Amino acid sequence: MLIGEAQLRRIIRSELLRESAKSPEDLPKGTKFIFTRYGDNEIDLDVKSPGNPMMGKLKITKSHEGCEGAWEVSFSNALVRGLGPLMYDAMMEFIYPDGMVSDRYSVSDAARRVWKHYHSNRDDVHHQQLDNLKGELTPDYEEDDCEQHSANKDRADGPNMGNWRQSPLSKMYSKPGDATLGKLYSLGMFVRRRG
């Protein structure tokens, strides 16, 4: 079976993302993952080390619309290559059983690759299709209605381009268990605060 050039590019990008993802053991000694909860509507994750006061930041806010009660990424910035997926894994475990969704209006290319990787390559991360605000998929159920602006403008590859339901950004993701948080805790990297 021959694969096309576009499919080969997707495979290579996926492998590069997988190989570049950091694990807690890859980070400098003294690195801290600081989870700060501000009431019931915002959680910040700041990743710092003694030599780098800001390695990465991930901010999530409780969705104002249905979205199955998911937390929405409102800000994400990883200044260390491969740290983004580790921050997302840690945050999804931290908020479980709640799920997490991408920013509903704007998603960087790097973040889109992470969401696509979760959707296509991570059996340990669950994904659930969300509806749009018109209720096209589940007209009699409003809890899954969610803004799909990012999914609508997503530059999805292949024949499904333009179909918001095919975009990894149209889903809610959750990660049961504590594989990542357990490692952070055992390495003395996990810090929980109230804002």
For the regions a protein language model found, what residue spans apply to each?
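Extended, structured, electrostatic nucleic-acid-contact surfaces
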Residues: 69-81
